[in-house]
Amino acid sequence: MNLKLNVLTIILLPVHLLITIYSALIFIPWYFLTNAKKKNAMAKRIKAKPTSDKPGSPYRSVTHFDSLAVIDIPGADTLDKLFDHAVAKFGKKDSLGTREILSEENEMQPNGKVFKKLILGNYKWINYLEVNCRVNNFGSGLTALGLKPKNTIAIFCETRAEWMIAAQTCFKYNFPLVTLYATLGREAVVHGLNESEASYLITSVELLESKLKAALVDINCVKHIIYVDNKTINRAEYPEGLEIHSMQSVEELGAKPENLSVPPSRPTPSDMAIVMYTSGSTGRPKGVMMHHSNLIAGMTGQCERIPGLGPKDTYIGYLPLAHVLELTAEISCFTYGCRIGYSSPLTLSDQSSKIKKGSKGDCTVLKPTLMAAVPEIMDRIYKNVMSKVQEMNYVQKTLFKIGYDYKLEQIKKGYDAPLCNLILFKKVKALLGGNVRMMLSGGAPLSPQTHRFMNVCFCCPIGQGYGLTESCGAGTVTEVTDYTTGRVGAPLICCEIKLKDWQEGGYTVHDKPNPRGEIVIGGQNISMGYFKNEEKTAEDYCVDENGQRWFCTGDIGEFHPDGCLQIIDRKKDLVKLQAGEYVSLGKVEAALKNCPLIDNICAFAKSDQSYVISFVVPNQKKLTLLAQQKGVEGSWVDICNNPAMEAEILKEIREAANAMKLERFEIPIKVRLSPEPWTPETGLVTDAFKLKRKELKNHYLKDIERMYGGK
């Protein structure tokens, strides 16, 4: 075996020699042609600085230091004006695209479950003028049905073109839009609809039949339901007095001359645009009130960090539009003339679960240049690709590693490796269509390991951002020239960020070498508070002596010397153990989530106990293979319940924890393996795949008692 490895190593020597010669010959012309010197200088420059020498002073972007940006396009101070600007500028250009469903087939899985598989056609596009026509017709139709300006209308629907058309209608006609995640459970949906007192609801037939129908008995105010599909439903199955319309019929009503002639009542910057209900990761969803001016300011900051945004770009929309990251990204793309092609997590790639084998996924057909992704999705891509690499033979694996390491070194220096991109990473890039020039990451911290992998294999920068629903998604975004990892960039030009001492956690603005503390964001992008929840609004929001709004995030950050922010902890994730040690559950999870055997992990601790435990969703393929090697037999559920497999996972956890330099008391010493993945549909994670700790605790209550010895 050693002889074989030595022979292969000798055979691979010419590869190393070729790389050395290639680097020497190509580097100098490439360096000047790509303006690498300027990019390096941009990457290393100071990006933000404090407004004064006083500790705790707010940091601002150096490019907009004297005042915060509040508007991007002159005169467009409301969302409807952004829409009108885009329609006037890009009229006949493709705007919103949807793939045709050619056929559906049921496919039996080995476990007996039946999966619906789709065969999809090409994207069908409507242009900006056609979107405008539909918006006008839908708005006039809603007005004809009796909806008044400043009266709320709710949307509970999957991400699709009709969602965006409905939203643009509401912005133009001054109907405050109440947004609800399509994956919310019955209790959360009922709460949001009743609290917002929305009398009109936009949804899909699937959600109407599967979730809303049974909940209508508890929903007080909804009088009109508009479904977006071109389908028919049996109205006799619904309560009397509830009017149900198709979106098409409402548009046809609005297109009548007597209705279309009624002009919309336009909003002002201080009018409510959205009441966005959160995903409820920490309990009951809260409605965040966003004025037009808040969203305009937030998107002004976000767009400044995406160079070259314009008509040559194609954006793939698949994340929930009820999430502030996706909504602001799509409105920004629409404003700048980008095409938006709609997708879903189940049809995104050729290997996605709803795509029939041999058919093409949405990325392959659309070939997007821009896309947003939550870290959970990037982590899955990373693990899947690296799993394929491990299955290669020795020569292939070694060639991949040589190319990967070489490009990684080039990236760390601020350079690139065009030959590696062409030869080694072309197939990996093709997983997302092959044309992605920038990816936006948000919703949760992205691990440095996954960040580097995406840089290397997908040959594009990752704009890692930090923002919250309460800040209209705006806070920080890394610049495309900044190839560091583990940070979320400098404050956007629309806001300023300061740190506040958190003595209990041991973080202060006087810490060395860098100031640390709770992140507080200020600017016009800060929303107006929580809907009908003055107590929580007063707790989390404040207004300073200059009238500027601030939001206390609950996240702990550290400012680096160049003005970039790093998220290092979260107040709500901190647990004090019985012996007095503080454990950051988020820190533990971040350190362990990239273990090959682990698909997802939730750390758990109680203040009356002395150790940390964990719940783990194992990687089915890898754990099944390990079980075979260890002689463990049975179903997937049997494998997950086997103590020997728990021991193997704990062994991997210990190794990874030691490699990441976790303290002894931070390392989970007991584990419960979950045979079922945590998806938004299970209610255990949000649509951005953030852990719902309360729900996870309730779900694993018996296991918690068992792992803590029945106490």
From Swiss-Prot:
One of its GO terms (molecular function) is long-chain fatty acid-CoA ligase activity. Its main location: mitochondrion. It is an enzyme of class 6 (ligase). Keywords: ATP-binding, Cell membrane, Endoplasmic reticulum, Fatty acid metabolism, Ligase, Lipid metabolism, Magnesium, Membrane, Microsome, Mitochondrion, Mitochondrion outer membrane, Nucleotide-binding, Peroxisome, Phosphoprotein, Signal-anchor, Transmembrane, Transmembrane helix. InterPro entries: AMP-bd_C_sf (IPR045851), AMP-binding_CS (IPR020845), AMP-dep_synth/lig_dom (IPR000873), ANL_N_sf (IPR042099). One of its GO terms (biological process) is regulation of fatty acid metabolic process. This is Long-chain-fatty-acid--CoA ligase 4. It comes from Mus musculus. The lineage of its organism: Eukaryota, Metazoa, Chordata, Craniata, Vertebrata.
